[in-house]
Structures are given as C-alpha cells and as structure tokens.
Amino acid sequence: MLIFFIVLICAVAIYYLISLRYRWIVLLVASVTFYAIISTYLTPFICLTAVSVWLCAAYIQRQNDSSADVKTTKKKNKTAMLLTILLNIGIIAFLKFYSPFAALLNSVFEKVNFDAQIPSLKLILPLGISFYTLQAIGYLIDVYRKKIIAEKNFFKVALFLCFFPQILEGPIAKYDQTAAQLYEGHKFDYKTVAFGAQRILWGLFKKMIVADRLYLLVKTVSDKPSEYAGIASLLLILFYTLQLYADFSGFIDIAIGSAEMFGIKLPENFRQPFFAKSAQEFWQRWHISLGVWLKEYVFYTVALSPRLMKFCGKLKKKHKNHFTKILPTLVSLFFVWLCNGLWHGAKWNYIVYGMYYFVIISSGMICEPLFKKLYAAMKINPDGKAISIFRHIRTLFIIFIGETIFGAGSLKNAWITLSSVFKPWKGSMFSLGLDYKEFIVAIIGIITIFTADFIKEKGVNIRESIAMKKLPARWLCYISIIVAIVLFGAYGGMYSLLPFIYGNF
C-alpha cells in the first residue's frame, strides 16, 4: 500500500510537469515500476500477455486492411484470436488450477492404491492476472469484431493492460473506455485532482475503519466455525459480506480516485448493491465491470452461436411456450455463472457460488409467468411498496447466503456456518475478536457507508454537494475523514496490515 502511494504521488507530480504529448509515458513508467516492485520475478507473465495480444491484434488488423477475401481473412483472424486467447487462458488456468487438480488426483490415486504421484508445485499468481487477462482478451475480441482499431504502439497496449491504479483489483475496463484517456495527456485541473484525493480518502475509510476491523471477528469465527453458533454464526454471515463490500469497494474508490488525479475516468464497479430488489439487479450493481465483461464476451458469444440458435429455433417450432423462448438466455447464463465461479478460483465453493446465482436468477425467469398470474389472482400490485420491501429483504437473504458460500473457504464450512445460526450459543459477541468499543466503531463505520449509499441512491452527488459549500464547511468534511482514519483506522496493536481481499484473485 505504501509503495502504491509513493508511486502515485511521484507520478502525479511528474505527469503535470512535462509536455502533454509525453504524459502517457509517465503513466507507463509508473505502472511498470509499481508492477516490477510488487510482482518482481512474475513480471514476465504480464509481458507475455501484452506481447501476444499486441502481435495478434496487429495481425488481425493487417489482414482486415489488406485482404480482399473476406471469408478466408475471417477464418485466419478467428484462428489467430482463438490461439492467443487459449494461450492466455492456459497461463491463468495452469497457475490457478494445477495445484488443486494435482492434489485431487493424488488423493484419488491413493484411495484406489494406484502407484503414481503428480508432482506438487508451489505456484504463485502474478499480480492482477485475473483482471489484466480479461482486459487483454476483451481488447483482442473487440479488434476481431472490428469494434476498435488495433493499437500499433506496443507500449500503449502495455499501458492499457498494466495501468497501476487498476492492476490490483480492477475495475476491468474495455479498450474504448479508457485507452484514449490514457494516451492523450490531461491538463492540470485542481477540482479533478481534489476530487480524486477525496475518493481515495473515502476508500481508505472503508478499508481501514470498517473492513480491517470486521476482519478480526470474521477470522475468529471462520477459523473454527464448528465451535460457534447462534449470534456468532449470524455475525460471521453479516460481517463477512460487509467486510468484503467495504474492502473491495474501498479499493475501487482508491483506484478510481487515483486515476482521477490524472484526469482519467475509470468505469464504476459498484452502485449501491444492497439496495437491489433482486439477485439479477444485485449483479448489475456489484462488481459491475466483471458482469459487463461476462455479458459482452461470454453471454452474447453463447447466445448468438449458430448451433444454439439453430437448436432453439427448432425447439420453438415444436413447443411454443415461455421456457423455449428464454432457453437461449438460460444456456448463456449457465456459462456466464460457471465462468464467474471459475474466475474466482479452483475451490468448489466458488463454482457452487456461481451456480447458486444461476439457479436463483434462472428460477426467477422461469417462474415469471406464474408470479404474474399469482399477483393478478391475489390482486397485488407488483410495484407496490409492500412487495418492494419484501423483494428487498428477500434479496438481502440471497446475498448474505451467497457471500457465505463464497467466503467460507469450503462447502463444509459454509454449511456449518449457515446451519449453526439457529443453534444455541452461550458465548458473548464481544469475545469474538472485537471488544465493545471496537464493535461500536465498526457499527458507526458501517452506518456511515450505508448512509452515503442511501444518499447516492437518491441521486445526490455527494462530492459535488460538498464542493458547493463554503470553504470552512468543505475543509471540515475533509479534515473529519482524515482524523477519523488516523484515530480509528485498524492498524497497530492487535491489527495487522491486511491485503485487499480481491487482490488474491
């Protein structure tokens, strides 16, 4: 974290001192420096991705520009694209799945008395590989689809893939969203830099006051879930989800704020997710950039595939009903949620997590006509306040259960935690890692975050509102959040410096 801010401060200072034409080079040098310091000997992996994607995109562009035979060109381009995508997916799949797969096979061999052993390797994931790989693949597919023109300059492609504010945890950006901003150079604007700094402070508030504090209780209970029940299990379910939100959205605030200090606008990744009224809406508000990527490059790829369209077309002619109408969507959603689970890692709980949301969302789509008939029969207004409140509460239950599956470490631990909520437990909730005072600080922090989310949900731009106030009032807000971070940030003593959760993916 310290290295990140040192690089950021130096980069901002130098960025605005040199010519506009060369400012993108400052971003590249800062990004490469940061990545090399943090990832050290794993840096060649991102270099391989950048080189392979740059070469393939250049080849596709050259074929499009020079060849008159459209059919042959498309076939060659598709082959080149698929080989490059397979190379990059192969790298991440090997690094993520080799060790768990080897361990699984070795355990099977042992049980059947098969005299063989797959060597175990201590593999470490390169920094941000899950994020920059998706950006690279998205860029390549967009060039293939002729949505964008391939960038000729390798170093500009490298900057797009390794821009240091977003390399750790995203947000995952499409080339046409950020490339021009990265390359063009921006004039100094006090408001833009100040707004960026404010966004960073808000991210630090979420991370240091809420996420890292909740971690103490989460770790205490999740390390030995079978020893706890009742309120302890319930707090684990609630606090892990809130910790994940504060941690992940906190980093995104830092990333977006850091980019904003250069005049660069990254895509938002969260939009008040806990105000959603359905699981589908939740995923339109949570980890938005991943959802957009999966929709653009997995959902539409499957839904518009000739084989699926042909099969569903024949089925619709024989059986004209609601299910056959939505079947292409359901098949596409299955692959989207499978990819979502696999993207997070090789654990079964990640795959079940993806399938959990697939079942929830697809069930809602399948049963939609039934719900409409039920509302009509019972004379219930589906847009009424009572139904709206019910949907909101139902969605919160779905979210908390889903995130428990996600964060439990194993399906066994997830089941133990969820099934223990209604069992008696005689301990005190203040013996779970947070004493009374720390618990109160955590709750106040959570209330502050959700108050801000509520205000934003009402359409109020908080930063603009603060900026319109008189100077003393503005600085009172800024100083208050700085003092809060300094006084109540979770560092020193019983706290340790914690990495961002999604940095592990």
Question: Residues of each region from the PLM?
Answer:
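Membrane-embedded transmembrane alpha-helical bundles that form the catalytic cores
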Residues: 2-504
